[in-house]
Swiss-Prot record:
Amino acids binding ATP: G38, E39, N40, G41, A42, G43, K44, S45
Species assigned in the record: Moorella thermoacetica (strain ATCC 39073 / JCM 9320)
Residue stretches spanning the membrane: none
Cellular component, GO annotation: plasma membrane
MF GO annotations: ABC-type D-xylose transporter activity; ATP binding; ATP hydrolysis activity
Record-given protein name: Xylose import ATP-binding protein XylG
EC number, as in UniProt: 7.5.2.10
Family matches, as Pfam families: ABC_tran
ABC transporter domain segment(s): 6-243, 262-504
Family named by the database record: Belongs to the ABC transporter superfamily. Xylose importer (TC 3.A.1.2.4) family.
C-alpha cells in the first residue's frame, strides 16, 4: 500500500462569486519531487495557500492529512510545525539582515532569553553547507545574487525541519547555471527523504526533475501521471483542455521596408556614467518582422531596448531612425508619439498600477492623445472593453482591480495598454515570463496578427526556444555588443549560446 506523507482531499475554496478550488485532490509521497502544473488561475497558488495556513482551517472545505493524520492549520506557524515550508517566487528575505539572521528569523536560538549568536552562526553554517552555499553566515542578503538568495530560503526551510518543501516558480529569475545548482540540491533533498512540490510553467524543467505530475484546470484536479509515462504535449493538453497544434505557431512573414534603425547606439551605467553597458550597437527591424534579441542576463538587452523607448535612467548616445527619418527620444512620451511602444520586463513594477482597474491601466498611456482635455469615461470603457475582448482577458469587468488578475491576464493588460497607442514598433521584453502555456500561445498568436498588420516587433527573451520559435531574425548580445546575427533558417541554440558567451 502506498504511503503518502501529504494528502489533500476534496479541497473546495470559494471567494465571492468565484469557486477557486472545486473538490481538489492532491497527494505526495515521502522523498518524491511532485510537479504541480496548470495555467494561471487554475488554482495552484490557492491550493498551496490552503496547505500553508494562509487560508486557515474553516475557510475551506475538505481535509489535509500529514502521514495519515488530519490537520487543522489556523496559521502559517501551524503548518510549519507540521513540517511544511513554502518558497514563493517573491523571496521573503530581509535584505539588510545577514544570512544567519534570515535563516532563523522568528526562530532564533535563545540562551537565558537572549539570542545565542554563536549557536545561530554555527547552525546557519551547517544549513548553508546542506544546500551547497559557500558564503559566510554574516553576509548581508543584499550582497547575494538571486540564485544564492533562493538557496538561503531553502536553508531557512530546512532549519525549521521541513519535510515538505513547496517551490513556486523557483527558476523564474535564475541563470542556467543557477538552475542546475538548484536541481542538484533538490535531488539531494529527495535522497534524504524531503518531499518537494515543484510549481512551474517550464515543462522542460518539470520533465527534467519531477517523478510525478498533477495538473489542475479551472480549480479542478484533471489528473496525476508518472513523468515517465507521459509527454509535454499530453501535459499541455491536460492544462488547457485542448490540443495546441504547435507551442510556437510561427507563420511565414513577408517583411517590408525598414521601420526602425539604430545606429552606433551606446548606453551608459547610471551609477557609473563613464561605463558603457551597451556599446556601439547597430541594428534594424522591418515592417512586418519579428526581430529576436538573445543574450545572457547582464548582456545589455533590457538596457538597450528600454533606452530606445526613453525609459532607462542612464544616458545614451547614437541615432534612432524611424521610417527613414532621424528622431530624438528623451522619454517614453517621445517614443509613444513616434509610434514606439514597450511591454517592459517586469509587468508588476513597470507596466501596471496594481491598485487601479483594468480600464484605467489599458488607457493610461493614451489619455493625453486619445481623450483631449475632457476625459470621456464611456469612450474609455468602450476602448478598454475592446482590448479585453480582443486579448481574451479573463475578468468579470473592466473595472476589476488589475492586482487581482493572474499573471497571464496581467500581461495581456500591459499588451493592451501598448496596443492602445497604435504602435508601428512594438518592443516586447520577456513577453511570456512567468505565464502559463495557454496564455503564451495566445500571445504568440497576437504577435503573428500584429506582424501581419505590418507592425515591427522587437522581442527580447531569455527563452531560447521562444526566440527560435517566433523570430524571423535573431541578434545576440554579449557584454553590450552584438556578437551574432542569424536568419531563422540558420539559427540554432548552440550557435546562439556560442555568441552569447563570447565564443564564435
Amino acid at each position: 500500500m502506498d504511503h503518502y506523507i501529504l494528502e489533500m482531499q476534496e479541497i473546495t475554496k470559494q471567494f465571492p462569486g468565484v469557486k477557486a478550488l472545486d473538490k481538489v485532490d492532491f497527494k505526495a509521497r515521502k522523498g518524491e519531487i511532485h510537479a504541480l502544473c496548470g495555467e494561471n488561475g487554475a488554482g495552484k497558488s490557492t491550493l498551496m495557500k490552503v496547505l500553508s495556513g494562509v487560508y486557515p482551517y474553516g475557510t475551506y472545505q475538505g481535509e489535509i492529512l500529514i502521514n495519515g493524520q488530519p490537520q487543522k492549520f489556523y496559521t502559517i506557524k501551524d503548518s510549519e510545525r507540521a513540517g511544511i515550508a513554502i518558497i514563493y517566487q517573491e523571496l521573503a528575505l530581509v535584505s539588510e539582515l545577514s544570512v544567519a539572521e534570515n535563516i532563523f528569523l522568528g526562530n532564533e536560538p535563545l540562551h537565558h532569553h537572549l539570542i545565542d549568536w554563536d549557536k545561530m552562526y554555527i547552525e546557519a553554517t551547517k544549513w548553508l553547507k546542506e544546500v551547497g552555499l559557500d558564503v559566510s553566515p554574516g553576509t548581508k542578503i543584499k550582497n547575494l545574487g538571486v540564485g544564492q538568495q533562493q538557496l538561503v530560503e531553502i536553508a531557512k526551510a530546512l532549519a525549521k525541519n521541513a519535510s515538505i518543501l513547496v517551490l513556486d516558480e523557483p527558476t523564474a529569475a535564475l541563470t542556467e547555471a543557477e538552475v542546475e545548482i538548484l536541481m542538484h540540491i533538490l535531488h539531494q533533498l529527495k535522497s534524504k527523504g524531503v518531499t518537494c512540490i515543484y510549481i512551474s510553467h517550464k515543462l522542460n524543467e518539470v520533465f527534467a526533475i519531477a517523478d510525478n505530475i498533477t495538473v489542475l484546470r479551472d480549480g479542478r484536479t484533471i489528473g496525476t501521471v508518472k513523468k515517465d509515462e507521459t509527454s509535454q504535449d499530453k501535459i499541455i493538453t491536460m492544462m488547457v483542455g485542448r490540443e495546441l497544434n504547435r507551442l510556437f505557431p510561427y507563420i511565414n512573414h513577408s517583411p517590408g521596408a525598414i521601420t526602425l534603425e539604430v545606429r552606433n547606439f551606446s548606453v551608459y551605467n547610471p551609477d557609473n556614467p563613464r561605463k558603457k553597458i551597451v556599446k556601439d550597437v547597430n541594428f534594424y527591424v522591418r515592417k512586418g518582422e519579428v526581430l529576436g534579441i538573445a543574450g545572457l542576463i547582464g548582456s545589455g538587452r533590457t538596457e538597450l531596448v528600454t533606452s530606445i523607448y526613453g525609459g532607462y535612467p542612464g544616458k545614451n548616445e547614437g541615432e534612432i531612425w524611424l521610417d527613414g527619418r532621424k528622431i530624438k527620444i528623451k522619454n517614453s512620451e517621445d517614443a509613444l508619439s513616434n509610434g514606439i511602444a514597450l511591454v517592459p520586463e517586469d509587468r508588476r513594477r513597470q507596466g501596471l498600477v496594481l491598485d487601479m482597474d483594468i480600464c484605467k491601466n489599458i488607457t493610461l498611456a493614451s489619455l493625453k492623445r486619445s481623450y483631449n482635455i475632457m476625459l470621456n469615461e464611456s469612450a474609455e470603457i468602450r476602448d478598454a472593453e475592446f482590448f479585453v475582448d480582443k486579448l481574451k482577458i479573463k475578468s468579470p469587468s473592466v473595472e476589476a482591480r488589475v492586482g487581482n488578475l493572474s499573471g497571464g491576464n496581467q500581461q495581456k493588460v500591459v499588451l493592451g495598454k501598448a496596443l492602445m497607442t497604435n504602435p508601428r514598433v512594438l518592443i516586447l521584453d520577456e513577453p511570456t515570463r512567468g505565464i502559463d502555456v495557454g496564455a503564451k500561445y495566445e500571445i504568440y498568436n497576437l504577435i503573428n496578427s500584429l506582424v501581419s498588420q505590418g507592425v515591427a516587433i522587437v522581442m527580447v527573451s531569455s527563452e531560447l526556444p521562444e526566440i527560435l520559435g517566433m523570430s524571423d531574425r535573431i541578434l545576440v548580445l554579449c557584454e553590450g555588443r552584438i556578437t551574432g546575427e542569424f536568419s531563422r533558417e540558420e539559427a540554432t541554440e548552440e550557435k546562439i549560446m556560442a555568441c552569447a558567451t563570447g565564443g564564435k
